[in-house]
Amino acid sequence: WSSDVCSSDLGYQLPADYLEKNLLYYLKRTSHGSTLSRIVHAQLAEMAQFHELSWQLYQEALYSDYRDIQGGTTAEGIHTGVMAATIHVTLATYAGVDTRQNELSICPNLPEHWQALAFQFIHQGVTYQFSLTQTSVTITADKDTQLLVQGALIPLTAERPKEVHYQ
């Protein structure tokens, strides 16, 4: 994670459990006064391998406006930041899409409650169609390209679906 790189570059060596300890510390102290708090903590919980907690916080964030969990704020409008963040967590955390390197990378980590996830994603002028299950991903790109699936470089031919199994 980028925080590990940043800390290392600054000369700090963080213990392996720093994320878990900090997450648990702050969860005991946060009021979740903003609905955005839940989705941020969902992301962190997944990073710390607290899958059930991540799922619970994700659901709360997803339904925060719909169910008006703060008692009357939905009439004032929806929180587009939370909406965008839930999409980000869906794609970056659960689907595992990573655009931080030169090659597009996907490392699926679907919640066990999900059987499948399908979405379109445009990266560097290439349109990808992804269809994920718990054990495979099928990818179609509109141009010849390549991407990483769980660290393995996968070549794609334009408009030809490629299925990759993982576990």
Task: Identify what each model region corresponds to.
Residues W1-S7:
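Short, small-residue-biased leader/transition segments that mark boundaries at the very start
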